[in-house]
């Protein structure tokens, strides 16, 4: 929200909705069974498509205006940033970029959560670089 306020002329409600809902499909993609295996639906569709389905179902019940739904769907579809990272479409709105970069920063910061206390430097496969864990 702070980023949206700093940028200005941003639909903060849409940013919040996108931030809360961009990964909602993971609730159906990943099972709650031991080991958290993927569901059949999850393997076949993936969380992005499943998020769209869930949001469409809710939007129909709430009678969300079509234009508003389209803006939210764009955020969900583009939250990985670009095609190379798995997004079916690339970010095209301020709100989509804000949600994408917030999600990306969150994923990067999570890489600092687990490390070997004996070695402050650790190679991170996801980021393909060494990270310094100073605390």
Q: What role is predicted for each listed range?
A:
Residues 100, 117-118, 122-135:
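N-terminal intrinsically disordered, cationic/polar leader segments
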Residues 3-115:
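Divalent metal-dependent catalytic cores for phosphoryl transfer on phosphate-bearing substrates
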């Amino acid at each position: 929200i702070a980023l949206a306020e700093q940028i200005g002329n941003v639909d903060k409600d849409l940013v919040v909705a996108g931030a809360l809902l961009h990964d909602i499909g993971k609730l159906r993609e990943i099972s709650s069974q031991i080991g958290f295996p993927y569901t059949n639906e999850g393997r076949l569709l993936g969380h992005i498509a499943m998020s769209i389905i869930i949001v469409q179902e809710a939007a129909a019940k709430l009678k969300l205006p079509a234009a508003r739904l389209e803006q939210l769907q764009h955020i969900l579809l583009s939250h990985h940033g670009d095609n190379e990272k798995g997004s079916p479409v690339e970010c095209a709105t301020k709100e989509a970029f804000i949600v994408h970069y917030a999600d990306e920063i969150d994923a990067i910061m999570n890489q600092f959560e687990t490390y070997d206390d004996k070695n402050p430097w650790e190679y991170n496969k996801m980021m393909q670089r060494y990270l310094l864990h100073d605390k």
